[in-house]
C-alpha cells in the first residue's frame, strides 16, 4: 500500500506534463500499472478472476 501522502500528491495536477505518472487507483502502487484500467497487475488479476472487469477473461489457446 502506498502512503496516503503519495496518493494525495498524485491526485494534484502536475506542474509540467512530464511529471505525471500512473498509480493504481485501488492500492496506489506506482509500478506495473495498466493505463487502460488504471490498475496494477496484482489488482487487475484479482478483479479479473472475480469477473469484476467487464470484457476480461482468462486466455486459453
Swiss-Prot record:
Binding site for Zn(2+): 24, 27, 40, 43
Cofactor remark from the record: Binds 1 zinc ion per subunit.
Keyword Metal-binding attributed: yes
Needed cofactors: Zn(2+)
NCBIfam families: PRK08061.1
UniProt subunit comment: Part of the 30S ribosomal subunit. Contacts proteins S3 and S10.
Protein role: Binds 16S rRNA, required for the assembly of 30S particles and may also be responsible for determining the conformation of the 16S rRNA at the A site.
This protein's name: Small ribosomal subunit protein uS14C
Organism: Enterococcus faecalis (strain ATCC 700802 / V583)
Gene name tied to this protein: rpsZ
Amino acid at each position: 500500500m502506498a502512503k496516503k501522502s503519495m496518493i494525495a500528491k498524485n491526485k494534484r495536477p502536475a506542474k509540467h506534463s512530464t511529471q505525471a505518472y500512473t498509480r493504481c487507483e485501488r492500492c496506489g502502487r506506482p509500478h506495473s500499472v495498466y493505463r487502460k484500467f488504471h490498475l496494477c497487475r496484482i489488482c487487475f488479476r484479482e478483479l479479473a478472476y472475480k469477473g469484476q472487469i467487464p470484457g476480461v477473461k482468462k486466455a486459453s489457446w
